[in-house]
Amino acid sequence: MLPSHVLEVSITPRGPNGGARPNEGRHVATSNNSAEGLARTDATRQAKRQVMKSTLFILRQLVTKDFKLKYRRSVLGVLWSVLNPLLMMAVLTLVFSNMFRFPIEHYPLYLILGTVLFTLMTDATGGAMSSIIDASSLLKKVRIKKWVFPLERVLFSLVNFLLSLVAVLGVMAFFVLFAPAESRLAFPGASMLMLPVLLVYVVVFSVGIGLALSALSVFFRDVMHLWGVVTTAWNYLTPVFWPQDLAQLAASMPNPQLLGALQAVEQFNPMYHYIVYFRDIFLYGTVPGLQENLVCLGFALAMLALGVLVFCKTQSKFILYI
């Protein structure tokens, strides 16, 4: 027995005079409409793919341009991305090891891990904040997605962070291979594979802040000055230099009663959770659990949603203020 769809094609209903019935033309018109709909859908998909390819090309070109401009006429060039965190680590280790004497094992590695990750966030958000204003001449001449510019600055900061990991790995290698036996660090191993997950959290979080700041700074230029003050205070409220274990910090605090307030602040400090995550996988060799991953993801998605909302609400008016 033939399938039903074969019977429908093979047997054509005829009218009284042997011609096609009136409904036949209706079936043909329906088939033509379906074909046109499929063609339009395919054209739409191709157009979206082309837009995506163009956007990725623009992002790649902008990141390359910024990278070349940053190291133009520099003798050491890209090596500064490695030397900067090393020099900062050396200075801060000297200061905090002699003045405050926090009981933190492998303090130079502890310090550089906190420094490079916090620097990623501050560089990404600070660059994204001024991206729309810096691209004002281009936005007035070319029709282009405005969110490309804040996103590009975040990706550029991510590239610099990946280069600074060379310095982190160098310090880690020292403690793993050359440190005295009593203070030698065990190689973290498989926990380091969680780094891409952490970077997704931090990049998404930074994109959210960057979108909001880039939109607000177009209308209120004071935001660009205020953000520097905010990040400085944020840096000191985050355990970059001091112990992330607040019980260790209590002995060094002039007023131990502040410990409870600080604990409450840290629970709502996204960078506290991201830096603890970073040290867990690189310094302590532990894989963060589900709860910590959900907290980090929640901060990232909440900030991204806020940034997208602010940016989409205001981007149509950018051209009037840049």
What are the residue ranges of the model-derived segments?
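Hydrophobic transmembrane alpha-helices and immediately adjacent juxtamembrane helices
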Residues: L2-G19, N23-I322
